Amino acid sequence: MTKKQKKMLYRILIAAVLFLAAKFIPMPMLVSTALYFAAYVTIGYDILRKAWKGICNHQVFDENFLMAVATIGAIALAIYEKSGDYDEAVAVMLFYQIGELFQSYAVGKSRRNITALMDIRPDYANIERDGKLEQVDPDDVAVGTVITVQPGEKIPIDGEIVEGASTLNTAALTGESLPRDVMTGDEVISGCINMTGVLKVKTTKAFGESTVSKILELMENSSSHKSRSEAFISRFARVYTPAVCYSALALAILPPVINLLMGNAASWGVWVYRALTFLVISCPCALVISIPLSFFAGLGGAGHEGILIKGSNYLEALSKTKIVVFDKTGTLTQGVFEVTGVHHSPMEDRKLLEYAALAECASSHPISKSLQKACGVELDRSRVTDIEERGGRGVVATVDGHSVAVGNGKLMDELGVKWQECRSVGTIVHMAVDGEYAGHIVISDVVKSDARDAIAALKRAGVQKTVMLTGDIKKVADHVAQELGVDEVHAELLPGDKVARLERLLGEKGKDDCLAFVGDGINDAPVLSRADIGIAMGAMGSDAAIEAADVVLMDDDPMKIAKGIQISRKCIRIVYENIVFSLGVKLTCLLLVAIGIANMWMGIFADVGVMVLAVLNAIRALRTSKN
């Protein structure tokens, strides 16, 4: 409990003692009245001050104004009627402050829970100077500096291990408890906890550009992206509060005036009392507090699972997802390509692979890496000149003075080279040397072990259609789609074709439905940004993915897509539960007040009780079920 909350608790206890003494201990009316006023001022002075400031700043209509008018009006009515019955005025203020304290504590607790879940900010970095370790601010560490990370410490900055081996706990980033073994030469990212050995890490980024900084910035900015529900509640409160104030004024004045015109007693006291109760009930605290809290808790719960959602607007859109479009490589497949065959080559297989690897040496594509791996020797890049990338088709380069073309059938057709079909399932890389066909290499990608379960989980979560887009050949794409149970597949697409195909799918979806695109974030930025929801998988350490996507999965587990949808739908369900419950109870009580059935005690429940229940319900969004 914070210092401010403790102070409020003491005020509540003092006011409660004074209130109970005045209510239940026999004493002269003057003494009991003094105790009531002492209790009222003790518990309500800050509400009265805020209400007065609001009036001075021309921001009249808020919950402080409602509470101040209702309670001062109740006191004035008691004085007018000479009843000495001030207990309702004090009780309204007392229970309102109890509700505010509970709400403050609950929100603070949920914030601390979320902060603990995302407690990845490093406090310092160790730099060795004169044989001793010196702790410095991570912001002061230059790129290329060697830092020491001891067991139990967080890795403060992204870098590469230059000495040592250890096991890393990545749970704060990925939500997974399985540790990761690392050794010299491995890249490590900030935010992971070093569990066993001492590591020396050469930093590759400044702290401000490291993974931990990007994630923290994302989480801190998520509250600025408001959902439609939050925006509606804000607009609703601006209209609702003045409306109920004027309604209460009408309830206090019109019925007595009508009674007078009809020759009956005005009964001013009865109708003013009802109007004051009307004000107590109408306070919109339950909605104004619980709706943002529900989204905040939902974002925190998702973050605990390694699913970073950039704002409540994206959380709301994710809950409406009916179509999920996948980029094949790196999402449904591991993106780890292996050479599985060399066919129809007049050259030696080793020579063919060497030429192919050299021609592709400037590319970062997984196929290029697999060719270099299959070659098995260190490549001398000085043997390669005039490298020309042909988008979506391949590459043409000069290797040892020979013109070497490496790519798909479209590249061979473009160069006028007659090529041969291959019946093997996989990516077929055709080669031509000096304009003559030199054979083809079969490269196969490995389907992720849980990809099929992920597609099934999406169907269970209510996704109506799954689609796969790939630049791979149709035969390979169809094979993968059939194996995984994907509904629709589009193959042999150039990067621009993927955007066009996505546009077509966007036109086919329902008006209120959303389409999510899932990619690895490396070269999917145009498609990620065009989809209703862009989801980047395996983004741990990828700046591009964190920047381009709306939802970032910190590891490459496709099951987390369905998990994210489930979390978002639970959060939205809680939001709607709170809206319906809060408005339902308040409207019912307002009606009962207007016809004289409900009193101010019922008004206290309709305000404070509903707020407490709504806040408790909102906190449920922080908890995520384990599948």
Description of each model-found segment:
Residues 63-71, 173, 273, 283-359, ...:
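Conserved catalytic phosphorylation-site environment of P-type ATPases
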Residues 116-209, 313-356, 398-399:
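Conserved cytosolic catalytic loops of P-type ATPases
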Residues 1-16, 34, 45-75, 216-250, ...:
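Soluble-to-membrane junctions at the N-terminal ends of transmembrane alpha-helices
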Residues 65-66, 91-151, 182, 309, ...:
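Juxtamembrane coupling segments of multi-pass membrane pumps/enzymes
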Residues 399-401, 427, 433-577, 585:
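Conserved ATP-binding TGD loop and adjacent catalytic N/P-domain core of P-type ATPases
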Residues 339-465, 474, 483-502:
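P-type ATPase nucleotide-binding
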Residues 2-124, 235, 242-243, 342:
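Transmembrane helix-loop-helix hairpins at the membrane interface
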